[in-house]
Amino acid sequence: MTVNGIKQMKGYANLTNDYMFKRVFGSEECKDILIAFLNRIVGNGDIEDVTFQNTEHLGPTADDRRAVYDIAVRTKSGEEYIIEMQLAQQEYFRDRSLFYASYPILNQAALAKEEFRKAHGDAGVFRWNFRLKPVRFIAVVNFPMTHGSGWDESRYFSSYRLKEDESGELLHDKLQFIFLELARFDKKEDELETYCDKWMYLFKNMSHFRERPKVFDEKEFDRLFEIAELCNFTSDEYYNYQNSQKMIYDYENTIDFAKKQGEAKGREEGLAEGLEKGLERGRIEIARNMLKAAISVEQISLLTGLSEEQVQSLVDEANV
């Protein structure tokens, strides 16, 4: 689309779009948006600045699995934040969250040693007292996570820490997992009560806005609405956004078709697993199309919910 065509566009971008999510929350130009979001979601309100960190962490050996985050930042006080947008449901997403959070924990020994050498040079023997800085993992997920039988189905926010089983005593406050479940959020504009409500509403509905709703007239949303307004995009930005958006549409359409196929198969065969088989076939077909578009194995895994090993097997199959 031409620049003039973009300038005539009305409305705002989809914040769950991979390109847009990383641009809004993972770029230096929009750092103030990320800080406002973190202060509202974590609730302490004391984050003044962050520095962006490497989003790819390699395992100890070449054969070990690596971790690739959407966004990683460190605050002035040394707290580490990992922020993820997950559209596709994954069976072991909680496990992956824990795996991801382990890297910044392990890296703190190296950081402590680096600080020691800056202060003392090569003199002295480095010893670390194991004092950790907090690590917080925040995930916005587009599916309902599994909870216990007493869980309120409308509760979209969950926060987990390490606690003693019987008393609930906190082991320490250095590891926290926060999950925001878009599938459980169904509040209307006039029902928004908290800033967390407002952020969830934006994730689900911003692409449907034609103008900025009055409920978002606070100053902290100014930059977000400026960046997300389609008429402010350059040609390259719009191209990248649309490419990422097409992946979402393709995924949703294929999964919807796969569900129908699976339901039909289940009715025909009387098998409860018919739906799941159809979904799995849909994910595999999406992955094959993404591979043809030269999308990375890691990105395909994140978007489809297939493991990297499953996607790699499709690569090997195509190369035979």
Outline where the language-model segments fall.
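Elongated, amphipathic alpha-helical interaction scaffolds
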Residues: M1-V320
